[in-house]
Structures are given as C-alpha cells and as structure tokens.
Amino acid sequence: MKLQNSQLQPQARYILPSFIEHSSFGVKESNPYNKLFEERIIFLGVQVDDASANDIMAQLLVLESLDPDRDITMYINSPGGGFTSLMAIYDTMQYVRADIQTVCLGQAASAAAVLLAAGTPGKRMALPNARVLIHQPSLAGVIQGQFSDLEIQAAEIERMRTLMETTLSRHTGKDAAVIRKDTDRDKILTAEEAKDYGIIDTVLEYRKLSAQTV
C-alpha cells in the first residue's frame, strides 16, 4: 500500500499511563492496552507492518483460545501499511472462529481499510467523522535490477492488486472492476460514504447523544 513520507516517520507519543487495580486476587498494575485486551478489544493505532501484524495476530489467536464463541472487537486508527502484513492479519481474522467487530476511529487508510471491511458482516462500524481511504497497492522503495527482475516485480504488483480488489469485492459486494477503477487514484470516503460503499455497516452515534434521546 502507498504511504506518504510523513506517515512513515516515527511519531513522538506521550507516556502510556498505568494504574492500579484491586481485585479478590490482589493488586496489579495495568495500562489501557492491557485493560482493552481483557475486554477482548484489540487496538490497531499504528501503521500496518510486520511488527504490528505479529502483535495483532498473536492477540487474535490468544483471544480465540480463551473463548472462541465471544466476539473480538478491533478498533482501527491507522494510515495503512504493507500488503503482506495486511494479508497476514486478514487471513488470521478469517481463520479464527470468533466474530470480529471492526470499528474505525479517525482513519482507516490503505491496508487498514481492507481490515475494516473484513470484519464480520453486520459488525463493521465507524464513528461519524472517521475517514476511509482506498487505493491500489504498491511495492515499497525503488524497483531496480535486470529487465527480467522488473518483469517479476511488475507481475507481483499486478497479483497484489488483483488480490486486494477481489478481497474488497468479497466484503463490500462491489464488482472487482468497479474497485479497480475506484482505486486507480486515492479514493477518500466519509463514514456515510464508506457505509454506502459496503466497507462498513453502521455509522455509530455518539453515546452521549444516544443517552439524551432515551
């Protein structure tokens, strides 16, 4: 998948806060990510690369082993990333028995958009101001080598593109030819447009507003 240079640069982050929990088993120190995991929530908040893919796959497999019949929720706010890392997570999502809810906060771009669409039908969501970006995959770096090597790389790019199109087609209901045309260039969708496109099923209401209407 294509990424802007600014998206590839390491970003500074604040120190993740920890907190103390008291239970019948004693006292333990925890942090937001551990707490989310206990609630069967996985948070993809970085670019999709080998490291983040391994983390996500490990969490999916552990949560399935703990209870294969309970839903897993994946929150997504990611600029996208590598195609092979994307497909590794995608295959694992389809492999585990548990239903997977996908929720976009902020953005699901490139590879992350495919993961958003790959959630269990009826359980794919986004917040109102989230955005989704889809485009054709690409190989990272400058392609160099003999002509025969360039042919191999070109064939691999075409294979990746076809696989991405058929994958999105499977989960959105759009014809693969339509997806090919739409992803010739960056296609940016609002949450409502992503719903119309078939990438998500529901645009979530704010909980405060929902509570006020009850």
From Swiss-Prot:
Protein family according to the UniProt entry: Belongs to the peptidase S14 family.
Function, in words: Cleaves peptides in various proteins in a process that requires ATP hydrolysis. Has a chymotrypsin-like activity. Plays a major role in the degradation of misfolded proteins.
One GO-annotated biological process of the protein: protein quality control for misfolded or incompletely synthesized proteins
Protein name: ATP-dependent Clp protease proteolytic subunit 2
Keywords noted in UniProt: Cytoplasm, Hydrolase, Protease, Serine protease
Subunit structure comment from the entry: Fourteen ClpP subunits assemble into 2 heptameric rings which stack back to back to give a disk-like structure with a central cavity, resembling the structure of eukaryotic proteasomes.
Catalytic residues identified in the record: 110 (nucleophile), 135
Keyword Hydrolase (UniProt): yes
Upper lineage: Bacteria, Bacillati, Actinomycetota, Actinomycetes, Mycobacteriales
Reactions catalysed: Hydrolysis of proteins to small peptides in the presence of ATP and magnesium. alpha-casein is the usual test substrate. In the absence of ATP, only oligopeptides shorter than five residues are hydrolyzed (such as succinyl-Leu-Tyr-|-NHMec, and Leu-Tyr-Leu-|-Tyr-Trp, in which cleavage of the -Tyr-|-Leu- and -Tyr-|-Trp bonds also occurs)
The EC number(s) this enzyme carries: 3.4.21.92
Recorded superkingdom: Bacteria
Any single Pfam family the record assigns to this protein: CLP_protease
Localization, UniProt: Cytoplasm
